[in-house]
Amino acid sequence: MIVAHNLGFPRIGGQRELKWALESYWKEQLGQQELIQVTRELRALHWKQQQEAGLDLVPVGDFSWYDQVLDMSALLGVVPPRFGEIQDEVDLDTYFCMARGRAPGKKEVAACEMTKWFNTNYHYIVPEFQPQQAFRLASSTLFNQVAEAQALDFPIKPVLLGPLSFLWLGKSKGSTFDKLSLLDALLPVYGQVLHRLKTQGVEWVQIDEPILVLDLPPDWKAAFERAYSSLVNGGPKRLLATYFGALGDNTRLACQLPVEGLHIDLVSAPEQLAKVLDEFPSYKILSAGLVDGRNIWRNDLEASLAQLEALRERLDDRLWIAPSCSLLHSPMDLALESALDEELKSWLAFAVQKIEEVATLKRALVEGRDVVAQALADSAAAQASRRQSERIYRPEIRARMTEVNEDMTRRRHKYPVRAQVQREELKLPLYPTTTIGSFPQTPDIRKARRDFKAGRIAEPEYRRQMEAEIARAIQAQESYGLDVLVHGEAERNDMVEYFGEQLEGFAFTQNGWVQSYGSRCVKPPIIYGDVVRRQPMTVAWLRYAQSLTSRRVKGMLTGPVTLLQWSFVRDDQPRADTCLQLALVLRDEVRDLEQADIKLIQVDEPAFREGLPLRRVEWESYLAWAVRCFRVASSGVEDGTQIHTHMCYSEFNDIIHAIAALDADVITIETSRSDGELLAAFAAFEYPNEIGPGVYDIHSPVVPTEAQIVGLIKKAAEYIPAERLWVNPDCGLKTRAWPEVETALRTMVAAAHGLRSA
């Protein structure tokens, strides 16, 4: 039977109900039972939405309190010893403590590391494996959710992260050892999970093995056959799910594994289909991921249907239809958007619409095109409208792109010359202290922004309130003793949305939220057309901030690669072309800041690494245009203007040459959660410019001690000469509260002062 299904659904709710419930619980304003009830109601609603849209199977286990990888750590009993001994099951507060470093009723402890989920803007909590790691069933959450869905009579397909991907995504702690050596101990527990699902009456289980789209070492490839052969008996039928890219040289391996079904991503890698079909066995089900799970563009139903009709000829009823990946990366429901203009809205589809597209494709295939004729006609009209719209292409932007030359990608002189000029002009001390940019977004700030957008206060009053917040941030930083100040970004709701709102070619949603990590949600803008800057975007705020202090204030911009990566990007031209348009816009803004006497300008690129293709063979091309775009944005200034950049959550030891090629005068990086591991890159590669390794983890409310910060700086000094070291947090302080910010920054400044006088 041809089946319409889904790999995963957004968790947060149409009105971010999960976010508000979690944060109330963490503040002890909501009890645990009330939190559990909120999440139970959300799950039931989401299952109902998917079933009513026409799906034959709805996912269970895709919902998470915080993160699906952390869920697997809890399920399998992978709890680091510092969180205490787990007697029976991992309780909810231990779970939150692993993610955040604190939870109601728990003492503060270092949180587990957090990093990017493949090449997305979602973050997962990294499993920590000990050399003699024991595994056992330590959570009933998945089984309870299965029972919930069954009690409501939903047709279900539980979702698990596969054993090889779970090990691959974790880190060895303690002594260095091969994570793969843990597989034999892990597999019996997976077997228990599958057996228990079988006893619950589950017919199909989805096992996600996204690492099959990566370059895998031979021993990991060999482990797949061993692992899945051991899981053949005693469980439900297994659908092996891959996404975010092509199987490539893992195609034969994936096709021949002893499982009953295979899901492939035909949006990010449509070219892989022919090779998969060549290797595909006659007994196996193929799930075709034809609806884009990561972007917001409406599906071309005619094109997808033509592909499915050809597949049905080959596979008959062994064909399933699905989004390309989990809809975790998509906003919830386009119906919640009332402010988008109708033309643009007709080009879009969010999670609810995407499952409707999946169901429509299945109905067309099974019942005939006539049954869904209106849906097909609407889809065709939307495709034609988008191709023909005059709002997408701007001739003057196309002309400027052709004028970009190599001189526009180079500073006037190399770093050693620039550094001497900057030392003379900026007169900064050894171990200069600064922050990454944002300060706490208080309820008053958020209210002022809401009131201004809603028209409840006029622009002069809004500006007065924002200037008061800027003054507060400047005064606070002066009192802490920081050397280079920032204006605090009170006027910015989001580091991408703020800029996009001032650029033509961008559109914005009211409720297009997607989960970044835990309760943290982002609302990516939509880049639908050529990008144009109407006027300076940050100059007035920075000029005001600089007028309040004799110390230097850093300008703060979001870089072209990050603007690209953290937006929903048009798919009608190469991403490199869109990035160049963004770089040209930022080049103009950087020069305007310099003209306004802002002599330190930070161009943030926290998403630089996440743009990397998953296959290494494709890295060179990406890095070439990403570096070029950054340099176009940042190279139009005088030697005395110091260009900073910032990267967070980045493991970029293997792209350190590209990082150096950015030629930023100063780079600040995240190192605190990973115990400074990132600095090992500098043992083999002497980074030529200045660097600020983050000395405390802003994502955890735990404040470090002065001794801890001194230790991190001393460790950094083993790789970087002291005269090229900066002292800073590892990320912006937007999500923190002022009391903890004050304590942490005073401690950080004290550590720097102590080292100067040592």
Swiss-Prot record:
Protein EC: 2.1.1.14
What enzyme class is recorded for this protein?
transferase
UniProt signal peptide: none
- Which InterPro entries does the record cross-reference, listed alphabetically? Cbl-indep_Met_Synth_N, Cobalamin-indep_Met_synthase, Met_Synth_C/arc, UROD/MetE-like_sf
GO molecular function terms noted in the UniProt entry:
5-methyltetrahydropteroyltriglutamate-homocysteine S-methyltransferase activity; zinc ion binding
Per the entry, which co-factors are needed?
A: Zn(2+)
Q: Name one GO biological process term.
A: methionine biosynthetic process
What residues bind Zn(2+), as annotated? Answer: H646, C648, E670, C731
Active site residues per record: H699
Cofactor binding description: Binds 1 zinc ion per subunit.
Catalysed reactions listed for this entry: 5-methyltetrahydropteroyltri-L-glutamate + L-homocysteine = tetrahydropteroyltri-L-glutamate + L-methionine
Q: Which residues bind 5-methyltetrahydropteroyltri-L-glutamate?
A: R16, E17, L18, K19, K116, R520, C521, W566, E610
Where L-methionine binds, per the record, is at I436, G437, S438, E489, D604
Q: In which pathway does it act?
A: Amino-acid biosynthesis; L-methionine biosynthesis via de novo pathway; L-methionine from L-homocysteine (MetE route): step 1/1
Q: Which residues bind L-homocysteine?
A: I436, G437, S438, E489, D604
Pfam families linked to this entry = Meth_synt_1 (PF08267), Meth_synt_2 (PF01717)
Assigned keywords, A-Z = Amino-acid biosynthesis, Metal-binding, Methionine biosynthesis, Methyltransferase, Repeat, Transferase, Zinc
- Record's function text: Catalyzes the transfer of a methyl group from 5-methyltetrahydrofolate to homocysteine resulting in methionine formation.
Family the UniProt entry places it in: Belongs to the vitamin-B12 independent methionine synthase family.
User: NCBIfam families of this UniProt entry?
Assistant: met_syn_B12ind, PRK05222.1
HAMAP family hit by this protein? Meth_synth
Q: Which named protein is this?
A: 5-methyltetrahydropteroyltriglutamate--homocysteine methyltransferase
Species for this entry = Nitrosococcus oceani (strain ATCC 19707 / BCRC 17464 / JCM 30415 / NCIMB 11848 / C-107)
